[in-house]
Regions:
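Sec-dependent N-terminal signal peptides
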Residues: 4-13
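Surface-exposed, polar helix/loop patches in the mature regions of secreted/periplasmic/lumenal proteins
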Residues: 73-106
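Compositionally biased P/S/T/G-rich terminal and signal peptide-adjacent segments
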Residues: 42-62
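A short, exposed loop/beta-hairpin motif centered on an aromatic-Gly-Thr core
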Residues: 36-44, 63-78
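Short Trp-Ser/Thr-centered turn/loop motifs at beta-strand boundaries
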Residues: 20-22, 26-47
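Sec/Tat signal peptide C-region and signal peptidase I cleavage site
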Residues: 13-19
C-alpha cells in the first residue's frame, strides 16, 4: 500500500504546484516603441498555446509586434510583480505601455 501512496503523491504534487502558476503575456513592437501586455491569468494551458492566442488577438486588431512571450510566475503575486517590472523597464526605455483586457480561451 505504501508504494501506491508514494506514487500517487509523486503524481499529485506537481499537479498542485502547476495549478498555482500564473502567466501574463507581452509583445513588444520595437519599431513603434510600444509593448502590449495582458493581465496575469492562471496558467491553465501551455505557454505555446497562450502565446499563439495572444499573437492572434494582436494580429486581428491590426497591432504590429515582433514576438510574444508569456512568462510564468509561481502564483498571482509573482506574475503581477514580473508584469510591473516589465512596465517599469519599458517606460524607462521610452516605450508606450498598452495594457489589454485579453484573457486566454481554454
Amino acid at each position: 500500500m505504501r508504494p501506491f501512496f508514494v506514487l500517487a503523491l509523486m503524481i499529485a504534487v506537481p499537479q498542485l504546484a502547476s495549478a498555482a502558476d500564473w502567466r501574463y503575456c507581452l509583445a513588444p513592437s520595437h519599431a513603434e516603441h510600444k509593448i502590449y501586455l495582458s493581465p496575469p491569468f492562471p496558467a491553465t494551458m501551455s505557454m505555446d498555446d497562450a502565446e499563439t492566442q495572444f499573437a492572434r488577438t494582436l494580429s486581428k486588431s491590426g497591432d504590429h509586434f515582433d514576438d510574444v512571450q508569456c512568462p510564468r510566475g509561481d502564483g498571482q503575486t509573482a506574475a503581477l510583480t514580473m508584469q510591473q517590472h516589465a512596465i517599469t523597464v519599458n517606460r524607462e526605455l521610452g516605450n508606450e505601455v498598452i495594457n489589454l483586457t485579453w484573457k486566454p480561451n481554454g
